[in-house]
């Protein structure tokens, strides 16, 4: 049952005890779910190759200082802004950037060297996210000259990068980006939210704003209910030349109506005084008065912004022409035509109180004028016999204000006029009544004369007032469309997607409508789609059968090959090279009749599934986290492929926030072994071809050998050397054996020279080394090298023997 109807909101606004505008010039209230949908549409439609920031690389030391995350060529997605549903006193928005590409290597210090213990290759199917909070109390709201509404993110906080397991390490990653964020120019740090119509009137040009979020008090508390979390985004706007309004109380009224069947999703309030100032411009009054007053002369007073706000007349007259009223009667069987005449007169603009028009804070504009005229009236019988001759000096006091009213759902200005007149020096001369040369004593005629005499200074003055107002009323109402003026200022994107349904004027002005109703009439599906390189997907529009023109636009990737789409909406994705993780395109459908455009964002990926980390080292007493993504976002089947029967660990759903799956090593540690190497495999339940694997190297004990890089290796090669207790193994005493584990990629010689395979797309190599000791038995060690080697010179340097020449 509706309990927040449009009528109840209007009644609340009408009550003078309620502070509706809180000192702000305009308040825009939008349903939060519609705003977030609109932001997603804007995100897609504004997407371009310029949206991407340059790839980011660097090091993030983790808590304790023993480990660091080395990030390489992180590609940030365009930021997505969304409003969370909080109360007015703790309003927040969040900005999320997915990491679409790059490599992450976790480095851990081992006494005198660093080791790579984890390698992650990021793509659009699986990767971390960068999130930050915008406390809407502290983020400055900016409106540029074109009406663009922007949020300057320099005041944002709580940067979180989900590239690590603990919240402390995630914050450290976020701080890395926070510091980097500060170095960005305004063009990349200031996020454009939408557009407020700036119009052509400085008085209605937005200058700044505050954004708040509000919970719908009628929303269900049941998480399963369709209206759970329902709420609104409120934008409080200050126009140029005004001060910002006051604080927004927590108990402020929820202003989106819930009338059954109406689907209202937006309400816009305008301060009536501010709107009146914009609608009732002094210049339009001057033009109107010039058209009706003879030789109108005036002085103009300007405000500090060079805007006329007062006009005072010092010359000119208003002419009222002679009016006649026939008063026929029958006398002795004949029709006698008697006439009551009011002679014309002139009302001087400069008189007792000169005609003045002034813009005010209360009524928008007010016209005042006190003037005098001489009223001459005659009651005349045939043969020009004046039965009555009357005259009086009349003082007229005129005041006109301009409140708003709603007429046929259109906001109009209806002038409210007050005209009072008073008479002085009244002279009435009554002459004998003569008809056809004969004196007449005819009772009906005598009664008419008596009535005219009695009403001369009362009813007759009212008629004069009506004549004056009839002369002024078409000219003192400026030719302005207030509704059109409102429409100029209430669209919140370039497509003007806020549609007005109802306008009310209960003191201030209220506009009730819907956000983006066109999407219910015409939209592309799916709005976002991920597909595999070389595959085909059919896009559709609703309603089915709509006549549209399809197009595809390159955004990121190979600009020479971004696929094609036919007239039926069938999109053919390009074939991506093996070293390219993804490419992005925009699909557009343009309606042939309305010209309305609906867009979809397409991400083409090389792999059907991704599993990360590609490899990681895990102590037998600990666990390892893994995360996967599949192109269809469907259910995945997880399994462990043991390299030795009975030694493998197991998988369980992760209990960590944002976690996916946890690998648990088999325990206790196996005696006589240094390593257990398990392969983790994911397979799409609906598409067995969508498969990916990763490796977990479980250390059963601390490896005896440490593998370091020796200097002076050729391009594409690294020379490895085994160390024990900080010293290289003596080749005269120990034969070191080398072996490539996990995925075999490249080659390694008997002397430990590793050579990368040509044109490989592998992102790591695991190399084992072992030597036989006469007393201690088999001594083992390992090293993980990120590939390709040339991209990871910094990490290779950290793994090098610092004593080597």
Residue ranges with predicted function:
Residues 527, 549-574, 639-664, 739-757:
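Low-complexity "stalk/linker" and mucin-like segments enriched in Ser/Thr/Pro/Ala/Gly
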Residues 454-526, 600-610, 698-705:
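Extended, charge-rich low-complexity regions and/or helical-solenoid scaffolds
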Residues 575-595, 599-602, 665-689, 760-785:
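A short beta-strand micro-motif common to beta-rich folds, especially ectodomain repeats
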Residues 522-530, 535, 552, 571, ...:
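Intrinsically disordered, low-complexity segments that are common in secreted/host-exposed effector
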Residues 259-343, 523-561, 569, 614-641, ...:
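Conserved small-residue-rich
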Residues 675-681, 685, 693-700, 718-721, ...:
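Disordered regulatory segments flanking catalytic cores
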Residues 2-183, 187-454, 487-519:
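Hydrophobic membrane/lipid-contacting segments
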Residues 456-457, 464, 516-558, 600-646, ...:
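Solvent-exposed, low-complexity, repeat-rich "mucin-like" stalks and linkers
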């Amino acid at each position: 049952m509706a309990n927040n109807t449009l009528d109840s909101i209007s009644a609340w606004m009408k009550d003078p005890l309620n502070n509706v505008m809180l000192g702000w010039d305009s308040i825009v209230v939008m349903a939060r779910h519609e705003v977030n949908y609109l932001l997603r549409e804007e995100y897609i439609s504004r997407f371009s190759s310029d949206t991407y920031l340059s790839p980011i690389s660097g090091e993030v030391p983790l808590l304790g200082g023993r480990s660091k995350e080395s990030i390489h060529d992180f590609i940030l997605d365009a930021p997505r802004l969304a409003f969370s549903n909080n109360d007015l006193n703790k309003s927040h928005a969040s900005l999320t950037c997915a990491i679409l590409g790059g490599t992450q290597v976790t480095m851990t210090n081992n006494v005198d060297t660093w080791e790579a213990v984890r390698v992650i290759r990021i793509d659009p199917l699986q990767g971390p996210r960068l999130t930050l909070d915008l406390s809407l109390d502290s983020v400055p709201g900016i409106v540029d000259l074109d009406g663009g509404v922007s949020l300057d993110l320099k005041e944002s906080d709580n940067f979180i990068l989900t590239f690590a397991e603990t919240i402390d390490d995630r914050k450290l990653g976020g701080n890395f980006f926070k510091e980097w964020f500060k170095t960005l120019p305004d063009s990349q740090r200031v996020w454009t939210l939408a557009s407020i119509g700036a119009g052509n009137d400085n008085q209605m040009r937005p200058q700044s704003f505050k954004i708040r979020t509000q919970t719908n008090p009628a929303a269900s508390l049941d998480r399963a209910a369709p209206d759970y979390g329902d709420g609104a985004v409120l934008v409080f706007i200050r126009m140029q030349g005004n001060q910002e309004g006051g604080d927004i109380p927590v108990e402020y009224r929820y202003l989106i109506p819930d009338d059954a069947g109406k689907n209202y999703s937006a309400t816009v309030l305008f301060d009536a005084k501010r709107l009146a100032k914009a609608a009732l411009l002094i210049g339009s009054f001057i033009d109107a008065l010039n058209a009706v007053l003879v030789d109108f002369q005036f002085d103009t007073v300007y405000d500090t912004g060079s805007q006329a706000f007062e006009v005072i007349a010092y010359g000119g007259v208003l002419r009222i022409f002679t009016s006649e009223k026939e008063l026929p009667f029958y006398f002795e069987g004949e029709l006698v035509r008697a006439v009551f005449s009011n002679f014309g007169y002139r009302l001087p603009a400069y008189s007792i109180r000169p005609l003045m028009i002034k813009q005010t804070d209360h009524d928008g504009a007010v016209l005042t004028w006190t003037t005098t005229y001489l009223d001459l009236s005659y009651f005349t019988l045939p043969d020009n016999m004046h039965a009555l001759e009357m005259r009086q000096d009349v003082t007229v006091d005129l005041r006109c204000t301009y409140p708003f009213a709603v007429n046929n759902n259109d906001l109009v200005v209806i002038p409210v006029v007050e005209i009072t007149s008073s008479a002085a020096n009244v002279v009435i001369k009554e002459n004998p009544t003569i008809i056809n040369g004969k004196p007449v004593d005819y009772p009906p005629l005598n009664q008419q004369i008596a009535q005219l005499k009695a009403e001369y200074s009362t009813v007759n003055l009212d008629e004069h007032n009506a004549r004056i107002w009839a002369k002024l009323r078409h000219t003192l109402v400026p030719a302005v469309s207030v509704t059109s003026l409102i429409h100029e200022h209430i669209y919140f994107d370039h497509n003007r997607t806020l549609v007005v349904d109802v306008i009310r004027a209960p003191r201030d002005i209220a506009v009730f409508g819907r956000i983006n109703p066109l999407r219910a009439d015409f939209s592309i599906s799916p709005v976002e789609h991920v597909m595999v390189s070389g595959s085909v997907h059919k896009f559709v529009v609703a309603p089915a059968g709509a006549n549209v023109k399809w197009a595809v636009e390159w955004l990121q990737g190979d600009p020479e090959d971004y696929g094609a789409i036919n007239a039926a909406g069938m999109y053919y994705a390009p074939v991506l090279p093996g070293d390219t993780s993804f490419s992005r395109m925009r699909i557009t459908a343009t309606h042939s009749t309305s010209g309305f455009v609906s867009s979809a964002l397409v991400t083409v990926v090389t792999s059907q599934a991704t599993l990360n980390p590609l490899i990681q080292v895990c102590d037998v007493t600990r666990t390892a986290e893994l995360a996967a993504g599949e192109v269809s976002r469907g259910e995945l089947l997880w399994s462990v492929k043991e390299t030795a029967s009975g030694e493998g660990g197991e998988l369980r759903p992760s209990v960590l926030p944002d976690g996916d799956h946890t690998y648990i090593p088999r325990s206790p540690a196996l005696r006589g072994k240094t390593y257990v190497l398990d392969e983790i495999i994911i397979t799409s339940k609906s598409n067995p071809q969508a498969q990916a694997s990763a490796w977990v190297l479980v250390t059963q004990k601390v490896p005896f050998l440490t593998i370091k890089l020796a200097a002076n290796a050729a391009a594409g090669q690294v020379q490895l050397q085994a160390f024990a207790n900080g010293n290289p193994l003596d080749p005269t005493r120990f034969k070191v054996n080398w072996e490539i584990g996990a995925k075999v990629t490249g080659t390694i010689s008997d002397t430990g020279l590793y050579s990368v395979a040509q044109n490989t797309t592998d992102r790591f190599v695991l190399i084992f080394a072992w030597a036989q000791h006469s007393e201690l038995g088999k001594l083992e060690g390992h090293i993980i090298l990120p590939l390709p080697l040339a991209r990871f010179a910094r990490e290779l340097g950290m793994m090098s023997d610092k004593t080597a020449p």
